Amino acid sequence: MRLIATYGTGCFDEFLWIFAAGAPNAHLDIVERTRLMRAAFRGKVLHDLNHVPDDYRIVPDELVQWGGTDNADILAWIPKGEPGDWPTVIIQAGQLKAVFSSGSSTATVLGLLDGSLRVPFFPSDFPDIRPEFSANPYA
């Protein structure tokens, strides 16, 4: 939640998108993106979610999508505990693989940008040496 308060909606390194409720662009609206994600997952078994620690066992309909990538990967909160501490699951496009991050969304983004959190299905050139944020990188 601090992530949205600090940056708002937009994109890191023209790859990692951050969503928020009420975003003027429907593609960046957390409610709309979550609705679309849940519809896409409905009736599917996401086997890699079995790797999410037992404390966070969830079904896809419980996830809240707070971010995504240009490759259609999904960053979703696992809504367990206090909202500011919700962990994240990063789901590869096509629901092939998933990576769990026990930190908040802010900690997850920081880990991705400083290299302490590696996602094997993210491009090798992400992040840039000097990551940049843009509210509208394609304007």
Predicted segments, located by residue:
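Charge-dense, low-complexity intrinsically disordered regions
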Residues: 127-139
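Glycine-centered flexibility motif
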Residues: 7-10, 22, 72, 86, ...
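Low-complexity, glycine/alanine/valine/leucine- and proline-rich hydrophobic stretches
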Residues: 65, 75-85, 89-94
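Short, surface-exposed beta-strand/loop "edge" segments at domain boundaries and coil↔beta transitions
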Residues: 25, 72-75, 95-102
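Compact, glycine/acidic-enriched structural inserts
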Residues: 90-123
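A surface-exposed partner-binding patch
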Residues: 1-71, 137-139
